[in-house]
């Protein structure tokens, strides 16, 4: 697919949260400034399994609802995870190629796993390396055999991590960010939700996205330049600015824990009512 400027759009696979749906995640993301992902083609599939229990968004957003896999109360044992991974690898291969992943909660957790596995040569060996990742309230898997592979080395993918001050997954989300080389962390005052973005957050995310787009175009669809390992983190609060200057966007225009996870994943309803 091509954008309005005739350039080929980069593709992002977007994975929804537990017992919601692709259409619900699309609605959540729709409250963001549309210019942020104007140069991306975004795909919102439904989870592989129908919801195995009550969805907390019942009465807020219409069914059906889905989940990607199941887990125990401590988020240390997983059911149907391998089947889910196989399904997504087939989806990415048959409907791709994709340039990156975006996910909320269970979807973000799963996306990070796919990125780590691909980096280690475990999956998607014939698919071009995924280049970018948008994580909203994601966390690491806790099963040692998974961690030893997926997070063995820092993941060299351009990543941005949204972390809520009131999110019950705040600390696990911070831990996930450390699994990536030079992550951009954007904090917000909300809870476990796809947050509404203030002007500064919009600017930071827009610049992050446009850096990737411009790098992709300048290398004629080659992989995005490797990230600089000498920089450990790009916390947005590291250097306060009086105003946010979206220089790159302007130039382009010119050119927790598992116990709570199952019970509270559906706080995503905040995304509708916020």
Feature locations, PLM:
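Serine-hydrolase catalytic machinery in alpha/beta-hydrolase-like enzymes
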Residues: 9-97
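The conserved beta1-alpha1 loop
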Residues: 13-18, 137, 163-164
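Gly/Ala-rich beta-loop-alpha elbow adjacent to hydrolase catalytic centers
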Residues: 102-112
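A conserved short beta-strand
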Residues: 124-140
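Acidic catalytic loop of the alpha/beta-hydrolase fold
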Residues: 141-142, 163-171, 192-193
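Short beta-strand/loop motif that positions the catalytic acidic residue
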Residues: 155, 159-163
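Conserved loop-alpha-helix segment in the C-terminal half of the alpha/beta-hydrolase fold
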Residues: 165-183
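Catalytic histidine-centered segment of alpha/beta-hydrolase-like enzymes
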Residues: 191-203
């Amino acid at each position: 697919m091509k954008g309005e400027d005739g350039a080929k759009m980069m593709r992002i696979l977007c994975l929804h949260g537990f017992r919601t749906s692709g259409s619900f995640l699309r609605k959540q993301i729709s409250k963001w400034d549309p210019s942020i992902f104007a140069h991306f083609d975004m795909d919102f599939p439904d989870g592989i399994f129908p919801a195995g229990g009550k969805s907390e968004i019942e009465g807020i957003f219409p069914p059906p609802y889905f989940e990607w896999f199941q887990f125990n109360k401590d988020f240390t044992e997983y059911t149907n995870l391998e089947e889910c991974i196989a399904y997504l690898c087939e989806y990415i291969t048959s409907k791709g190629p994709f340039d990156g992943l975006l996910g909320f909660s269970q979807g973000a957790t799963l996306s990070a796993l796919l990125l780590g596995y691909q980096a280690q040569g475990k999956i998607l060996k014939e698919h071009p390396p995924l280049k970018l990742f948008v994580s909203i309230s994601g966390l690491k898997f806790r099963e040692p055999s998974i961690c030893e592979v997926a997070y063995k080395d820092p993941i060299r993918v351009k990543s941005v991590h949204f972390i809520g001050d009131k999110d019950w997954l705040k600390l696990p989300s911070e831990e996930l960010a450390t699994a990536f080389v030079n992550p951009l962390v954007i904090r917000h005052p909300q809870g476990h939700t796809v947050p509404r973005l203030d002007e500064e957050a919009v600017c930071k995310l827009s610049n992050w996205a446009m850096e990737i787009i411009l790098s992709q175009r300048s290398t004629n669809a080659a992989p995005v330049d490797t990230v600089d390992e000498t920089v450990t983190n790009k916390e947005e609060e590291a250097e306060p600015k009086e105003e946010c200057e979206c220089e790159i966007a302007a130039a382009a225009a010119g050119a927790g824990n598992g116990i709570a996870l199952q019970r509270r994943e559906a706080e995503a309803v905040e995304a509708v009512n916020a």
